[in-house]
Amino acid sequence: MTWLEPQIKSQLQSERKDWEANEVGAFLKKAPERKEQFHTIGDFPVQRTYTAADIADTPLEDIGLPGRYPFTRGPYPTMYRSRTWTMRQIAGFGTGEDTNKRFKYLIAQGQTGISTDFDMPTLMGYDSDHPMSDGEVGREGVAIDTLADMEALLADIDLEKISVSFTINPSAWILLAMYVALGEKRGYDLNKLSGTVQADILKEYMAQKEYIYPIAPSVRIVRDIITYSAKNLKRYNPINISGYHISEAGSSPLQEAAFTLANLITYVNEVTKTGMHVDEFAPRLAFFFVSQGDFFEEVAKFRALRRCYAKIMKERFGARNPESMRLRFHCQTAAATLTKPQYMVNVVRTSLQALSAVLGGAQSLHTNGYDEAFAIPTEDAMKMALRTQQIIAEESGVADVIDPLGGSYYVEALTTEYEKKIFEILEEVEKRGGTIKLIEQGWFQKQIADFAYETALRKQSGQKPVIGVNRFVENEEDVKIEIHPYDNTTAERQISRTRRVRAERDEAKVQAMLDQLVAVAKDESQNLMPLTIELVKAGATMGDIVEKLKGIWGTYRETPVF
């Protein structure tokens, strides 16, 4: 069933042609439009106006109702009328104790979920006393080497009452092992713990470039995380398949959406090869997207993603459980849009991006601090960012009605166009040999780089306005702003604890277990998670584990693409 009978559609199209020729034509002689053509950030043409004729061919069942397949209007029947989105401001700097204080501050301000950023050594699997870590310990995230660090990070936080998200990828399974070990040590029922580990390694090869091992063993690690969690962490999201970093690397919103779903397909294929049915693990798959500057395009993107995901899971993978077809996503406002000139304007940018995320049906949200173009956000910036979410939730009324932009001719037309283009890209990926092959060939990387270059040219020419940068520019010789300070004692404090853990552990036991881990890694039918959990309990460091597996897997070196 479609929106309109063909005769009514034809009448509307005729009426619009008449309007263009008469009212529009006459008015343009007096007041020309601002530019010849209008496009979204993602290069979708934008018409002057939209009517029911523009969505006449969209099946009504593709729009549907919230909480009903294909979930275009939202994954749940009551959405924010029952519970508003999780307000999950990210934090991470210094040692576990330092970040723990920020967590507690944000919780006291009304935050409802925890999100953690890690420093570069932790992300790349180096201990804090490794030469490669020099100058980086705790600088751009929290340093985590051992289970003792995880204990400090989450001290006095009830893990059964608040969900914890870890933004980490190549070494994600080790962080998850520490989290599980901590949960067991505290006596929690693991099936009551909720949260997310990002663990999306494929987008690292595409965009963020934080990887350790070659692609095949890295995808195996993701498989092991998902299969272990499906059996042992029933409420935990074992992966956050991320378009955010693809966007921040310079992609279009369409590329962000399509490339993320290409990665999804690869992961689901790998897990189902183990014999696990999609309904056994898909209900806990989660996603992470950006909310960019084009308000209506972002809303349409989120709606189209839900529709595409539902169809992929049902039609391609044979999902029968509706929970396997609901796309749930965390959203973050676009860090790449933040500016140093006139930095307080970032509050307005972030507010609009947050609103589009909410109107697009996000399950959790991080709003960027106004100072994040300079450094890690200060407490004041994070409080302002959190208050932004709270005002949207409590004062604006947008949380009181589900999918209020549903039925908008423009939004519905753009949603359907997004769906069409996403599936076209996915078909092209299949024809070219699949996601992994195209990563190895640099196809995704080149697509992202080309769009990023086009965007840079548009900013440089002024075709893409950026207030304070190429429009309404002020002469600011020195921008004065209080930024988050780096504590120069961080590395010393962190390294001291790591070395203490090494000194107190049973070294022979740890080395024997590391040798066992090599055997498990060589046997792809086995899962790395159980032994990794025992290793961190025994005092093994992240660096111990990562370096041991480099011995059999090696490291990844990207082939440059021009």
Curated annotation (Swiss-Prot):
Q: What happens when the gene is disrupted?
A: Insertion mutant cannot grow on 2-hydroxyisobutyric acid (2-HIBA).
Temperature dependency:
Optimum temperature is 30 degrees Celsius.
Q: Which NCBIfam families match?
A: acid_CoA_mut_N (TIGR00641)
Query: What does it catalyze?
Result: 2-hydroxyisobutanoyl-CoA = (3S)-3-hydroxybutanoyl-CoA
Question: What's the protein called, per UniProt?
Answer: 2-hydroxyisobutanoyl-CoA mutase large subunit
| UniProt xrefs under InterPro entries | Cbl-dep_enz_cat, MeMalonylCoA_mutase_a/b_cat, MMCoA_mutase_a_cat
Keywords carried by this UniProt record: Isomerase
- Effect on the protein upon substituting residue 117 to V: 1.5-fold increase in catalytic efficiency with 2-hydroxyisobutyryl-CoA as substrate. 3-fold decrease in catalytic efficiency with (S)-3-hydroxybuytryl-CoA as substrate
**Originating species:** Aquincola tertiaricarbonis
Instruction: Give the EC class as a word.
Output: isomerase
Family statement drawn from the similarity comment of this UniProt entry:
Belongs to the acyl-CoA mutase large subunit family.
Q: Which GO terms describe its molecular function?
A: cobalamin binding; methylmalonyl-CoA mutase activity
Q: What does this protein do?
A: Together with HcmB, catalyzes the isomerization of 2-hydroxyisobutyryl-CoA and 3-hydroxybutyryl-CoA. Is specific for 2-hydroxyisobutyryl-CoA and (S)-3-hydroxybutyryl-CoA, and shows only very low activity with (R)-3-hydroxybutyryl-CoA, isobutyryl-CoA and butyryl-CoA. In vitro, can isomerize pivalyl-CoA and isovaleryl-CoA, with much lower efficiency. Plays a central role in the degradation of substrates bearing a tert-butyl moiety, such as the fuel oxygenate methyl tert-butyl ether (MTBE) and its metabolites.
